[in-house]
Amino acid sequence: MARSSPYLRQLQGPLLPPRDLVEEDDDYLNDDVEEDEESVFIDAEELCSGGVKAGSLPGCLRVSICDENTQETCKVFGRFPITGAWWRVKVQVKPVVGSRSYQYQVQGFPSYFLQSDMSPPNQKHICALFLKECEVSSDDVNKFLTWVKEVSNYKNLNFENLRETLRTFHKETGRKDQKQPTQNGQEELFLDNEMSLPLENTIPFRNVMTALQFPKIMEFLPVLLPRHFKWIIGSGSKEMLKEIEEILGTHPWKLGFSKITYREWKLLRCEASWIAFCQCESLLQLMTDLEKNALIMYSRLKQICREDGHTYVEVNDLTLTLSNHMSFHAASESLKFLKDIGVVTYEKSCVFPYDLYHAERAIAFSICDLMKKPPWHLCVDVEKVLASIHTTKPENSSDDALNESKPDEVRLENPVDVVDTQDNGDHIWTNGENEINAEISEVQLDQDQVEVPLDRDQVAALEMICSNPVTVISGKGGCGKTTIVSRLFKHIEQLEEREVKKACEDFEQDQNASEEWITFTEQSQLEADKAIEVLLTAPTGKAAGLLRQKTGLHAYTLCQVNYSFYSWTQTMMTTNKPWKFSSVRVLVVDEGSLVSVGIFKSVLNLLCEHSKLSKLIILGDIRQLPSIEPGNLLKDLFETLKSRNCAIELKTNHRAESQLIVDNATRISRRQFPKFDAELNISDNPTLPISIQDKTFIFVRLPEEDASSQSSKTNHHSCLYSAVKTLLQENNLQNAKTSQFIAFRRQDCDLINDCCCKHYTGHLTKDHQSRLVFGIGDKICCTRNAYLSDLLPENISGSQQNNDLDASSEDFSGTLPDFAKNKRDFESNVRLCNGEIFFITNDVTDVTFGKRRSLTINNMAGLEVTVDFKKLMKYCRIKHAWARTIHTFQGSEEQTVVYVVGKAGRQHWQHVYTAVTRGRCRVYVIAEESQLRNAIMKNSFPRKTRLKHFLQSKLSSSGAPPADFPSPRKSSGDSGGPSTPSASPLPVVTDHAMTNDVTWSEASSPDERTLTFAERWQLSSPDGVDTDDDLPKSRASKRTCGVNDDESPSKIFMVGESPQVSSRLQNLRLNNLIPRQLFKPTDNQET
């Protein structure tokens, strides 16, 4: 990789576009290019409000700049939103050593100045280039330039009179072409004033005209608002441009706050950073000290929340950190200024960024409203549900593993239902308990199988789900969180299918059955497209894929749910179809520790307002690293709800092969050194002992190093490379498809990938120009989400792609047109997700129509597709993936995991805990013992959040009682265990039956829970991009939370709620009870 010098230089002069466009195409292979982070999360309601979402950063180009001060022509590599020889730019650059294609790399973004006089004496050449860029034919360009030379002089030609000159040229040449002169003077006047030339609609022409009218926009907006700049100058109205130009000359500080930019121009998450303002000295001179201090304080507040994960900062701490920039009085005034413009919120000497404050409050309000709704009990025998798990194939068996990217949703053919008093009275979930239990009693263990003792924690967890509107389940990998939840809803699905089928068969046998009766098969076919009622979600694409694979049900990312609502609002007027998730009654969120409060707030609010949501289930591990974004959602909800019997921890490991891994994870959470069942010392000539072949938790000990030694870093890399090379000879690491290296630092990942690439494929990860190299056999991962339809080669044949999709073709049914439609839907709906791992199985370069390279990639879960290599790099930004950082691999798991500790540095026990729990069967830890001990002993940095406080306050004020369980009854064989409903043939009146005439809209209070969009405006994400895990201020290094208790949370003691104090008595209405009936009575029957 090219080494860069910290010395910065300012270049100013004409911008010359790249000459060699073919060579430019390879720039996407450079690994040292500044990463373009995906746009920040945007709330669906913000998008629906008509706001303009930020675009991506401009692409990187190689250009030449002729410096006006030294007359030197410098080759520069960086992000230039517009190019052309008629522009002058001013930009900060740093020298780059080791690159043959460019001398300097841009720091930040350029300012643009139009050469309105076309830079004499080059007017002719610049004008020709400009007209060519404006899609004017070469003949017309030559005719125009000849005419200019005859009529006037090139010296008089400039951009200010170019439009009029072109109009005059077209008018005069038009007269010559006409046989008869214009007969009406008014017609001539019309031609002079109203004639619109075709080139006036081209982007280069509009940019030039904008620069003439609004020079400040061209100078400052590319630096201040690089993601919005091109949209503003290309699509923004003249009024908007005029207002922004005026603000840049009077109150530029307003561009530093997204709330103001949204209010004025509907720009979403659009605000300039303080660092960007510092590059515009003339703008700083227009600001008062108060305005500058407010921008500094706002920037510091966002930085603290981003790096430490806080959702608020105490006033004293904030002012203290700014003591070197402003006095205490100035800080107080700045804070008041920020509060007055609505950017921050005060509460008890705490300062919140408004978006985080609103997110935590909105979550608390939504959860409280769910808990106040009339209770909905799933009347199932949870012990028999759990017992049925042991009589079926394991969820993770190869036979049951589903394609993570199948297009067709694996829906319930007769989806589960809940109490809906308006139109769903006959569904099985709303029937009396006697009907449910009668069917459940049919589920029995096979006689030749030994009954497995049930996990009482799992029993209690399922009872919570059946009884409570909100349930939080925490536990380590292998405790069965996902298994029991998916099994519960599959069980209910089977019961409903069985009852519907039996009822249909009985009715068909009736002699009086109508000829119009639809058979069970036909009915099932009609209901195949029934709406989703149990929605499984995860925070990342990879986690959603694993959830889909484990459960056999379709799973979505939270962002997909959010954006699907926006997409629906754009088409609902024409399609007249309901929102895809409008029938959701149960929301399951897996990997809850990774969920940010902003995304969760948005999705929960959408489902509460626009679906029939009645149950929320959150799964995760409270000891894992929290979200990389501010907040600590899972831990806050768990600690708040456990006292109300709505949260529980599963403590028993159900993977026999991973017991030692689970035990060591517990030790690590208690800051104790783990117990290894094998050790391997790395020396000059390490050999792999046979004794570790059947071990589970292996310590690969690196030699201790002297930190003061100059060769310490070199020795560490040498020892690490030797350790990795040695382990690659081990049987469990022979297959890269079932093993994964994990490291904390990205530089360690690079070294491991180099070693693995050479071992598995025989080539290096980079060439002599530090460009990434990919080939057959490479293990790669996507670092961005992208749809398959955006990645397909332009000239791919239908038959070829159909063959690639054979693994999923069983989901395509019907006629050939139906198949074609399904195929298009497949390509449009399938996403390659951030974090998803693929293997390259084929690499073809087609030179027929230019150099086009295609890769065939396989995710080893049923999806194999051929994609365009350049598109794959552009949209997915693929990287080698034999080694991943712990933060990017969190939410995934593998059979064998190798964790490289490296230097302890900022690592603490949660990093080690999260890493080792990624392994299902075997874990290797490569580390110096002292560094491993330091990391385990280091406490995590507690996050300051207010979700717990908001939720406790809201629940207390609303009088929501602790959860209780229906029909309490001690189960056989465990007098002290959790209760389960009895399988009684007699009907049992349950709470949901008593509230049959209470609609959900009456039970909730949306006006109390939700604010208007204007009131809950969210700010932009923190400024700056930090993508390297080993940087001092990496966001990932601060992903901590305050799990300080060494022991696991105590088991929940379930106590039945006293009817005397139950607020649910207010909802009991005995006067409207209606007996449950499968079919409506005829006129002569009693009602």
Swiss-Prot record:
Catalytic activity: ATP + H2O = ADP + phosphate + H(+)
Region annotation Disordered: where it falls in the sequence: 953-989, 1015-1051
Modification sites for Phosphothreonine: 1027
Location in the cell: Nucleus; Cytoplasm; Chromosome
InterPro entries: Coronavir_polyprotein_1ab, P-loop_NTPase
Stated regulation of activity: Inhibited by salt concentration greater than 100 mM. Uses either magnesium or manganese ions to support helicase activity. Binds strongly to single-stranded DNA in the absence of ATP but dissociates readily in the presence of 1 mM ATP.
Keyword hit for ATP-binding: yes
PTMs per UniProt: Phosphorylated at Ser-967 by CDK2 during the G1/S transition, resulting in its nuclear export into the cytoplasm. As S phase progresses, its exclusion from the nucleus promotes the activation of long-range resection.
EC number: 3.6.4.12
Record note on quaternary structure: Binds to RPA1; this interaction promotes HELB recruitment to chromatin following DNA damage. Interacts with at least two subunits of the DNA polymerase alpha complex: Interacts with CDC45. Interacts with TOPB1.
Protein name: DNA helicase B
Gene responsible for this protein: HELB
